[in-house]
Each structure stands twice: as structure tokens, then as C-alpha cells.
Amino acid sequence: MSSLIMQVVIPKPAKFFHNNLFSLSSKRHRFSTTTTTRGGRWARCSLQTGNEIQTERRTGGYQPTLWDFSTIQSFDSEYKEEKHLMRAAGMIDQVKMMLQEEVDSIRRLELIDDLRRLGISCHFEREIVEILNSKYYTNNEIDERDLYSTALRFRLLRQYDFSVSQEVFDCFKNAKGTDFKPSLVDDTRGLLQLYEASFLSAQGEETLRLARDFATKFLQKRVLVDKDINLLSSIERALELPTHWRVQMPNARSFIDAYKRRPDMNPTVLELAKLDFNMVQAQFQQELKEASRWWNSTGLVHELPFVRDRIVECYYWTTGVVERRQHGYERIMLTKINALVTTIDDVFDIYGTLEELQLFTTAIQRWDIESMKQLPPYMQICYLALFNFVNEMAYDTLRDKGFDSTPYLRKVWVGLIESYLIEAKWYYKGHKPSLEEYMKNSWISIGGIPILSHLFFRLTDSIEEEAAESMHKYHDIVRASCTILRLADDMGTSLDEVERGDVPKSVQCYMNEKNASEEEAREHVRSLIDQTWKMMNKEMMTSSFSKYFVEVSANLARMAQWIYQHESDGFGMQHSLVNKMLRDLLFHRYE
């Protein structure tokens, strides 16, 4: 490794220049807000770069952050103390014994499913894989004619990457094989498991498509008549967002609430889930504090008052994407990426003139300090923050993995900025792209590729150049993850962005192209998300990338659907429901 370091030159983070940017306070932008005929809000500011030039600019109208620096730094939790770790260890041993000693095959599978939903399955991975491995090779313990057990077994095996054929459901279909048997409609628990299992389908699996349609139709009817409160709650939850599309930790609290109401609740499992939740929350708070210190030190939110100050929301995203406890470094890194993507996105979408955006793109393509000097002051600090961050991450990867990631990281950030410029040109020309033209660019402009690129280099144990090349030719798993991220984002933010005068999003592109209603367009986008998940599911079963990189790629898509599940902007506009979910995970301990 030492010889490799001698041969690779990574630009030194340009901290020597960073301090000079804070002397630009005399050039801070002066805002006065006016409305325009194009919709949205505009700000009039002066850029003092010699001669004073009046430039009309948009503003996003975003609200200030709900958590200032001092508030974030004040968070503390007793659950980071050693005594809680020791207590949890004792309960983990007890649950391991339950898994080993449970003789009922279905009860074992149900316990595994509960552990996953409670967010504590990470403590039992070896035991779970051993149990599922035995279930994969022996079917004798499960009645293949029982829909509930068959569907539960199928779903868990696929979730753990076992190759299970959809043919296990053939015995539940009618004689012609065209639909499922009508006699199943009274098996509500079985239908719920069938519905959940259907979301692990890959492209071309017709039986699972039939299963989804059949189960959905009858579960929607059961919601209106079923009197079992716990079962009804599970059905409503699944119809809102199926288990396979849900992130684990952000959902854990609500499942703990549901689990403790069940008559078959295990007190030890419940107590472990509550304690573990509070311990993880304590860890998350420490990571958030570190990310917040970095954000404060960049000065971006002070020098660029038009950008979204959302460091807490940026961190919240990471808790669903990088779920394993030991990857705190990666969560903090991802928080920084989210903050930088958000900042640069606001520069392109809201504030920069087309000429400035072209200058910024050229500077990013050249990737050197000299290019930065041609930028207006507000862009210089943005450029330098990104430049320093990427070089620092490349250095850490070289130090820890012995691999120079610099050219790959530069490529993905340049690609992101170039996609932003394409959309800026559409805006200034008043261009309305077709849905195909829009998606060709927007799955890149959503910002998922830099996230996955950085995570690839951190989460791959032994990095091979061939794998790095495959990843950065935008492998199908990257494309699927970013496509779902884009479409889910569009479903939640498109109306707000169109009101600001932005280019049409996927919903509006479809409406313009097909002369469709908004609801028809949204239904089409939902179908695109479903189709893309089938591509994702196939990649999850067959991908040559590391198991955990595949997992975080899927989690990026899941977190997008979690944030935007009610088709409103839970990030930029601080939607009250998302705000509550964020507080419950990061700040409110479980009593």
C-alpha cells in the first residue's frame, strides 16, 4: 500500500484559500422579494464583483431550520453508557436461545420477521441465516397447502437472497392457472402474507403479479369489515407501503408500538427492542452532532442564505440508507453529500444565472483551484466546499482501502453538475421535455449517483478496478435505485417546484405529452416505480457487488419512498408528518 500512495497524487484540501472566502462579508447579497409573471418568488440582489450589477433571481421560499447549531449540540442521552450495552447483551443471548429452541417452524419464521421489523435482527444474523438455510433445503416442516406459511417462508427467503421460485404458489391458483382460488378470500392473514410476498417479484414473474392484484383487491375490502384491530392495523400499514419497500430503523418505533399491543408479544423481545432503539438513538445523536459541526464550519448556510438549511433532515436520510450500526463514518459522510447536493441544487434551481451556472460547470469539469477564481464569490465557497470534501474522501479511501477513487468520484460529481446545467438550460429556454427526455437526464440529476459512488468505495472490502468500472458505467442496480429516488421525489415535490417556475417533473411531463389528468400521470409514475422495483429485485438476487452495497442501493430507494410516501415534500418544506417521524427517531427516547 505504501508504494501505491507514493505514486498517487490527491490534491490537498484547499483550506488555505477557504479562510479568505469569509472576508467576503462586505459582498453579501442584499435581498428584496418580488413576484413575477412566471410564478414562484424572486429575489433582487447585487453581486459586487467590481461594477455593481443588478440581477433578478428566484428564491425557494424555504423556511429556516427547526434546529440551530446550539440546539443540535445540546442533545445528549444516557443510553450511550456502558451499563445499557451490558443489559442488552444479556437479552440478546436470551433471544438467541429462543431462536434455537423454538420447535414450531412457523413460530420461528414469525420471530425472525418480528426481529426484522423491530430493527434488531442485526444481532441475530448468523442464527437467522442458519434457520433460513435449513428452510431452503427442507420443506417438510411447512404445509405447502397453507397460504400463510408458504408466503411468509417465500418472502423471508427472498429477503435473505435465497433463490425461491414463484411456482410455490401454483397450488393456490385455479384449475386454469389464470387467478388464485376464490376460497382464499376468507384467509385474511394468508392474503396479507401473499400481498407482502408479491413485492419481491422480478420482471416476468406473472404468478406474483396475479398474487398482488388478487390480494390487494380483497385486503382493501377486509379493511372495511375486519374487527381484529391488530390485523387491521397491519393491513392498513401494508397497503400504505409494503414491508419490502420500507426502511428498517425509521420504521422500528411504530412497529414497537404495534408489537406491544399483540396478544402473542414476547416481553423479552419487546424490552430488547425498546432498549436497543434508545441505544441506537444515542449513537445517532452523536453522529448528527459531528455532521452539524462540519456543516457549521463550512459557512455555506451563512454565506448562501437562499439554500435550504437542512442538516438534520440530511442526516435523517442516512439512518434508512446505511442501517448497520458500525457504519457511523459512512452516515456522517452521506450527510455531507446530502448537504452539498442540496446546496448545489439550490444554486442551479433557484439562484444562479445561466452564465454563472455555465462558469460553475466548466470549473467543476476542470477540477482545480485556478478555475474557481473565475466564479462569483458565492459560487467560490460552494465550489471549494465540494472540492475539499471529495479530495478528503478520496484520501480516506486510499488510506483505508489502498485504492485511488479520485477519478471515479470526480466523474460522478461532474456528471451531476452537467445534468443540473441541462435542466437550467431547459428552464431558461422554456423547454418542456418529453417524459423519456426528462428521465434520461433526471435519474442523474436527482443526486443518487454520488451517494452510491462514495458508499461503494467505503463498503466494498476489496475494491477491484473491474468492479469500480462496472459501478461507474451506471450498472442496473445504480440506475434502478436512482430512478426510484427520482420518481418518488417527483411525486412529493413536483407541485412546489412547478409553482417556483422550475422545469416540468415526471408528472407534468406525462400530463403534457399524453394530455392526461394529474391523477392519471401520478398513477403512471407509480407504475414506473413498481416496474423499476422489479429490476431492483432481480439485481438484489444476482448482483456481483458486495451484499451490503446492494442493500444500501435498495435502501436509498426505500428511504425516498418513506420520505415522500404521502406525495408531499417532507424534506424541503418540513412536512409535519416527516418532522414527527424524524423527531421520534432522533430525539424522543422510547419510554
From Swiss-Prot:
EC class, as a word, reads lyase
EC number in record: 4.2.3.108, 4.2.3.-, 4.2.3.111, 4.2.3.15
Q: Does the keyword Lyase apply?
A: yes
Report residues binding Mg(2+) 1: 345, 349
GO BP field: alpha-pinene biosynthetic process; diterpenoid biosynthetic process; green leaf volatile biosynthetic process; monoterpenoid biosynthetic process
Q: Which residues make up the annotated site Confers catalytic properties (activation of water molecule and hydroxylation of the alpha-terpinyl cation)?
A: 338
Query: Carries keyword DNA damage?
Result: no
Pfam families per UniProt? Terpene_synth (PF01397), Terpene_synth_C (PF03936)
Where does this protein chiefly localize? plastid
For the motif DDXXD motif, give the residue ranges: 345-349
| InterPro entries reported for this sequence | Isoprenoid_synthase_dom_sf, Terpene_cyclase-like_1_C, Terpene_cyclase_plant_C1, Terpene_synth_N, Terpene_synth_N_sf, Terpene_synthase-like, Terpene_synthase_metal-bd, Terpenoid_cyclase/PrenylTrfase
List the molecular function annotations (GO) for this entry.
1,8-cineole synthase activity; magnesium ion binding; myrcene synthase activity; pinene synthase activity; sabinene synthase activity
Give the residues the record marks as binding Mg(2+) 2: 345, 349
Cofactor(s) the protein requires to work: Mg(2+); Mn(2+)
Q: Which domain of life is it from?
A: Eukaryota
Could you point out where the transit peptide sits in the sequence? 1-44
Q: Where does (2E)-geranyl diphosphate bind?
A: 308, 345, 349, 486, 489
Q: In which pathway does it act?
A: Secondary metabolite biosynthesis; terpenoid biosynthesis
* Consequence recorded when altering residue 338 to I: Lost ability to produce 1,8-cineole, beta-pinene and alpha-terpineol, but increased ability to produce sabinene and acquired ability to produce limonene from (2E)-geranyl diphosphate
Q: What is the effect of changing residue 450 to T?
A: Lost ability to produce 1,8-cineole, alpha-pinene, beta-pinene and alpha-terpineol, but strongly increased ability to produce sabinene and slightly acquired ability to produce limonene from (2E)-geranyl diphosphate
Give a Gene Ontology cellular component term annotated to this protein: chloroplast
> Bound how, and how many: what does the cofactor note say?
Binds 3 Mg(2+) or Mn(2+) ions per subunit.
Q: Domain comment?
A: The Asp-Asp-Xaa-Xaa-Asp/Glu (DDXXD/E) motif is important for the catalytic activity, presumably through binding to Mg(2+).
| SUBUNIT field | Monomer.
Q: Give the family from UniProt.
A: Belongs to the terpene synthase family. Tpsb subfamily.
Protein name in the entry: Cineole synthase 1, chloroplastic
Q: Which species is this UniProt entry from?
A: Salvia fruticosa
State which gene encodes it. CinS1
